[in-house]
Amino acid sequence: MKIKFINYLLLFFIIFLNYNGFVKSDCYQELDLVLSNSCRNGPSKLVIHESIYSFESIELTPFVQPKLLNYYSWDLQDGINYFISYRYKNCSNIISKPFASKGMYYKLLAEPLCLNTYIPVRVYNWGAGGIEYNFYSVPSTIWVNSQNGLCSFQSPISPQSYTKGVLNDGALKFVGPTCGFKNGTITIDLTKGYSNYHLFLQSDYLFDNEIQPSSEGFYNGLESENYSLFVDSEQCATERIEIYMKDVFAPLEIDFENVPDLFHNSTISLSLSSGNNGILNNTNINAFVIQSERLLTDWNHVQTQITSNTYYGYAYNKDFSTEAGQTKCVYSETLLFDNYSPNFNFTISKSESCLENVSITFYPLPNQNIKVYDYSSESGIPFSMKDNVLSVENNLNLWIFDTNQNYGIVHSTVFDIPSYKIIETSNGIGCWKTYNITIVNYENYKNLRIHFYNENSEFNFYPVEGVFINVPALYYYVTYNAGDCETESYFVIDKLDRNTPMDNVVLEFNTLEIGNCTHETSFMVTVKSVFGSYSKTMQTFYDKEFTIFLPNCSCQINGIYVAPRLIDGDSLIYELLTDPNCNSTDTLIRFTSPSQDYSISSVYQNGVQLQYYNNLNGYYISSGENNITVNYEGDQYCYRTETITIQSVYEVPLVQITPVSDCRNPNGKIEISNFQIFYNLELVFNSNSKPINQGFIENLASGTYTINYYSNQTCINSITVYVPSSENVAEITTSVISNPTCDNGPFSDGMIRVALKYEGNQINNFTIQNQDAEFTYLNDGVYPIAGVGVNSLTISYLSCIWKRDITTVLNKPSFTLEKVFNDTCDLQSVYKLVSSNPNIEIDYIDSSNGFSYLNNYYLVFQNSGDFGYYVAWNSRCYEYYTQQIIMDNYDRDSNVKYIDYEIVKPDNCNSLKIDLIITNMNKFISLTIENKLPTPINSTHSIFKNLPPSKSYDILYTLLNGCVAYQTVGIDEFKSGFTKETIDIIKTSDICYSGKASIQLSNLDFDNYYYYIKNSNSLMGVTDSYDSIQPQQSGNINGTILLSNYNPGSYKIYRGCKSMANCYLETNVVIESEDPIIESISVTDSYDKLNNGTVEIKLNYNSPYPINFKIIGTQLSNQNGKFGNLTPKTYEVQVTLTDRMCPVTLSKSFTINLKTSPPTPSPQDPSDELSTSSFVQVNLLFLSILIFTIFIF
C-alpha cells in the first residue's frame, strides 16, 4: 500500500511539472516590448515574442484588438500613449507598463476653411524633434518625408468650404501683360471683406521681396511671371493664391468674304480686334496664313485654300525690331473647319417597270470625285459612269463615295416597299415575345416570306393571307418580289431581344457515349421552353460551356456540360523493374503512354499520388493489391485504371489496437497476432525504441508509433500504427467562432472553439493542433488559423489525443472605395478603403496609388477608369480587387456645364459666319477656342465673332478657382443647319398602315440647292438611305412640293448647297399611323311631321374594304353612310371597318331637330325657272289629251 501511494505521488509530481511547463516561474518579469514605427505604408506595431501560452491575460489601454499568431502583435496609432497590462499563467499579480510609438504624425495648427487657406502643420517625430510646414490648396494630401529620408507619411485633407474665397466670389481679377510689355494687372476688391494682401514672385521662396501695390488693392506694370498672393479674410483666414501671369495677345479677327470650302480657294480679310490704335497694329506685326505658307503684306482680300488644317496668326519681335534671331511673340489660331456631309447632288429617273434600269444623274461640287459601288458586293469595283450618269438595275444598295472627302452615303434603288403593321400577340418578356406582321396589299407581292438566320441555321416563315402569325422575336428579313421584278427585294424589321428570361427554361443532359483518349464524349442537351422542346447533340473532351440558339426565335440559352472523365478501356502498359526484397517491400514500376500523342501527367495508388523518380525512370508501389490510375495528357485529358497485385516476399505484422481510456495513467495497447514468425519486434516512439515481447506492449499514450519487424537477423522493415483515445472518457464540443475570410489553403484566419470535459470536469490546459501542421495552440480552446472547408484537428490532454473534423465556410469580405473629398480641376481625388466586414484588420494596400495613415488606407486617382489594387488583412489574407472610378472633375464628358452661351446663325448662305456669345464671362478667368480669344462686350458678355462653320466648338476655359477644362458647344444647335433658314413642312399622318402619308415642303429653291429625304427605317438591310427629291415631281408650284405615299417611320429632310459644302439644313419628320376617325356628320332636320330628316357620315379614310354604317336602335344600315326619312331625335351611328390593317369600330352621336316649315328656297336663275315652266305646260297638255280620250271611249 505504501509503494502504491508513492507511485501516485510521483505521477502527480510529473503531471504538475508537465502542466507548469506552460507557466512562468517569475510572476514579476517585465516583458520585452518590440516597437516598430510606421514608415511609408505600414502602421506602427507592438510585438511581444513571448509565447501566447505564457499569459493568463494581456491587454492594451486604449483597447486595441491583438493579432494572434504564435505571439501577440498590435497595430498602433502614432501620437497616443498606451499602457500594456498583463498577468502570467498561474500568477495573481497584474503588471502595467506605459509605452508609445515614435512614428511620424501631424496636427493642423489651423482649420482648412477654404480651398486655398494657408495652413501651418506641425509634424511630430520628423527627426530628432518635429518640424512645421505651411500647407495650402486643399483638397489634397499632405506628404512628408522624414529628416533622414527613410520614412514618409501621406494623409488627406479637405476644406470646410469649396465655394468661399477670393477666387470664387470674384474679388480677385488679373490680366496678363501684352507679350513683350510689362502691363499686367492684379485687382483685389477690398469691399468684399478682404485685407492684408501681399504679393511675391513664386521664385522668392523666403518671401523677402514683397511687390508693392500701385494703389490700394491694385497692382500694375506686372510682367509675365508666376506670383504668390496672400489675402486675409474672416471667412477663409489667410489664403495663398498662385497666379500664373501669361502673355496676352490682341485677338485676330478673320472675315470670310466667301464661305470656306474644301479644295478650292476662299477669300478672307484679317484685322485686330483692338483696331490699329492699340499697342499692336498691322504696321508693327506680321500676319500669316499657314496653308498658303506665306506672310501677308496686305491683310485684306487674301486668296487662300482653307481646310481643317489651316491656321493663321501674327508674330513680332518683342522689341519690334526687324532683326532675325530675336525673342519673338507668336500668336496663332486654328480654323475649326469641319466639313458637313453628305455633299452629293443627284437626280433619279425610274420606269414603271422593274425590268428597266434606274438612271441616276450626279452634279458634283467643285473638285468632287464621285465613285459608286455595289454596297453588298465585296469586289470593290465601282460602277462605270458616263458624263456623271449611272444606269443600274433596281433593288440594289449603292455606296456613293467622294474619294476626296473620304465620305459616302447609301442610296437604295428598291423598286417597291410594302407597308406593314406589327402587333405583339403574347404577354411574354424578352425573346419570348411573339408578333403578328400584316403586309398591306400583299396581293401585289410574290414570294413573301420572313427569312431568319440563327447560328448556322436558316428558317423561313410564310404568311397566311398576308399575315405572318405569332412570329417570335427576331431580326426579320422580309423578302418579296415586287411587280414584274425578277430580283428579290427585302426590308428589315428589328424585334430582336437577347433578354432570355430563364424562369420557364429547363435543361436536360443525356450522355450518349463516353469518350476515351482518342474519341470525344457525345451528349445531347434538351431545352424545354415556352416554344416547346429543342434538342442538340454536341461532342467534347472537356467540360463544355455552350450557347444554344432556339430555332424560330432570338432566345439563346447558355449552359455548361460537365464531362465525365475520359477512360481508356485498354489495359495499362507497364513493366516491373524490381522485386520486393529485404531492403524494401516496394516494387519499382514503369508505365508507358498509349501513344506518342500523350504523356503521363500523374499516377495514383489507392487514391494517393505517387512520386516519380527521374533517376530510376519509374514509381514505387507497395506489395499487395493496388488500384492504379494513370492520367495522360495530350490534346485532351484521359486516364486508364487497373488493379495491379504485387506479391510480397515477406509477411508483415498483423496488429490489433486497444485505445487509451485513462489519460492520467496511459493504458493503450498494441497486440501482434503473428509475432512468432518474426525474428524480432520493437516499438519506436520519439527516436526511443522498446522491445515487443510476446507480441504485445501496453501502457501506451495516444500517438503514432513505428513497429520495426525483423524477418531475419539482417532484414528489417517497418509499419506505422496509431493508438487512439477512447471517446467514452471525454466530452468534446466544437463551434466556429468566425469563418475564414479568405481561402488561403489549410491555414487561414478562421477561428474554432474547442471545449473539453474529462471525467465530467472542464479542462482548460489542453492543446489544439492541425493534423497537417506544426502549429500548436494552447489558447483557452481557440484554434485561430482555420482554413476553408474541413479542418482536421487533434485535441491533446495528458496522455490522450482525440481527432475532430470541423467544417468552415468562406466569409469573404468585399472592399469598396469611398470618396474622401470631391475631385476638382487637376487636384487628386482620394478614396478611403472600406470593408464590408468591420471585424477584419487591414494590413496594407499594395498599389502604386495607395497610402495609409493612422490605420486608414487610401487610394489616389487623377482620372476615371478601372483600377486594381491588392488588399492584405488579418495577417493571412491577400487578394486583388478592381473598382471603376468615375471622376466628377471638369471635362468635356461631364454633365456639369459651366458656360452659358448663345449661338447667332447667319440669315442665309450668302454670309456664312457664326457668332458665339458667352453670357457669363464673369465666371471665368479666360476662354479660348483653339487659341482664339473672345472680344469683350461688357462685364458679363464676350463674343467669338465670325467663326467658320463647324459641327461643334471646343471651348477651353479657366474657372475663377483655377480649374481648367473643356466644354463642347453647338452640337444641338447645328443639327438643323448653319443658318436661320427653315423648310416649311406640313405632314399628313398615315392611316391604317396604308402607306399613303404625305410630306409637303415649301420655300424650296432648286436653282441653288438640292434636297434629300433620308429614310431612317431599315431598308434593304441599310438604315439612313438617301433619296433625292426632284423638282419635276407633281405639286412643284412656287417652291412647294408634295411627297406622297410614305410609310410610317422617321425621316430627315436635308438641303444641300450646289456651290458650297457647309451650307445645309436638316429637319426631322416622324410619320405615325393612326386609326380612322369620323371626319364629318352632315344633318338635314325634319320639317312638320314628315319625318324627312337626313344624315351623311364621312370618314377621313377611303378603305379598299367594305365599311359598315349602322344607326343604333334601328334597322338602318348600309355601306355609304347616307340615311333618310329620319324622325326628329338623337341617334348614335356605329361605323365598323373591315379593313384588315385596322379593324376598328367608331361611334358618334347626332341629332335630327324638328322644324315647323321648310327652309326658304334659295333664288333660282332664269334657266331654272324656264325649266320648271316648260315642265308644267307639258303636264297640262298631257292631262287634256287623257280627258278627251276617256270621253270618246
From Swiss-Prot:
GO CC term (a single one): membrane
Spans within the Extracellular topological domain: 26-1172
Organism: Dictyostelium discoideum (Social amoeba)
Transmembrane regions listed in the UniProt entry: 1173-1193
Protein name as annotated: Putative uncharacterized protein DDB_G0271238
Glycosylation sites: 90, 183, 226, 265, 281, 345, 357, 436, 516, 552, 583, 627, 712, 765, 822, 938, 1038, 1092
Signal peptide: 1-25
Keywords: Glycoprotein, Membrane, Signal, Transmembrane, Transmembrane helix
